[in-house]
């Protein structure tokens, strides 16, 4: 009986072994080849020290660019601005973020944009400050920044160096001509429009644009 039982047990173990091996999961099998081998060690070493936390960003949007104010309004250096909009129904923290390429502007710590509100960056904050509603942050450009009238690249960069938004505007092609020295600013049309495309922008209806307030051309 012992021999028969041993054969039965052994046979049963052998018969279920293939099934069991296909169902087993090895945490250390990083390359998923059903065994823990040297390649798994190389993968581990290549990623040693990396954080396993996933960063979740709530990105504001480049929503208005006033790159060529009209002579009626005043000098370019006084009235140029770039606006960001918070599309979320809650306040977002943007301390440590920055605008780069065409202009340089680093956002100080404890900088917040109110829910569905705005942040303005400009060369001459003293001139633009009286035009803004209360609680709209106004940050100065650095390094003698200024917007080119013929076109510019504007990048919004997160604190970790990744790109949150990127607009390359122009005064040519299908870009709105109303924003090129005719008095209006370049306004993003709103949600549903990809702001990397020229057709997602329009010249503002108001002289000098709509800094710190909903865009005059919003279609939603």
Regions found by a protein language model. Name each.
Residues 1-7:
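Positively charged n-region of N-terminal signal peptides that target proteins for export
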Residues 22-24:
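Boundary at the C-terminal end of the N-terminal hydrophobic targeting segment
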Residues 7-18:
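Bacterial N-terminal signal peptides
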Residues 30-52:
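Alpha-helical segments with a strong preference for the paired helices of cellulosomal dockerin domains
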Residues 26-33, 62, 220:
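Disulfide-bonded cysteine-rich modules in secreted/extracellular proteins
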């Amino acid at each position: 009986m012992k021999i028969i039982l041993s054969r039965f047990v052994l046979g049963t173990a052998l018969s279920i072994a293939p099934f069991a091996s296909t169902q087993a999961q090895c945490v250390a099998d990083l390359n998923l080849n059903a065994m823990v081998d040297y390649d798994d060690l190389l993968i581990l070493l290549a990623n040693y020290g990396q954080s396993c936390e996933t960063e979740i960003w709530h990105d504001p949007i480049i929503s208005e660019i006033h790159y060529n104010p009209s002579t009626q309004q005043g000098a370019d250096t006084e009235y140029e601005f770039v606006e960001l909009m918070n599309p979320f129904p809650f306040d977002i923290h943007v301390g440590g973020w920055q605008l780069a390429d065409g202009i340089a502007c680093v956002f100080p710590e404890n900088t917040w944009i109110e829910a569905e509100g705005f942040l303005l960056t400009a060369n001459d904050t003293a001139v633009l400050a009286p035009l803004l509603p209360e609680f709209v942050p106004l940050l100065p450009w650095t390094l003698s920044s200024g917007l080119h009238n013929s076109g510019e690249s504007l990048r919004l960069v997160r604190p970790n160096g990744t790109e949150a938004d990127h607009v390359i505007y122009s005064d040519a092609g299908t870009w709105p001509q109303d924003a090129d020295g005719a008095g209006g600013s370049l306004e993003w049309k709103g949600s549903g429009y990809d702001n990397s495309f020229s057709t997602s922008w329009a010249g503002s209806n108001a002289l000098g644009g709509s800094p710190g307030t909903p865009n005059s051309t919003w279609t939603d």
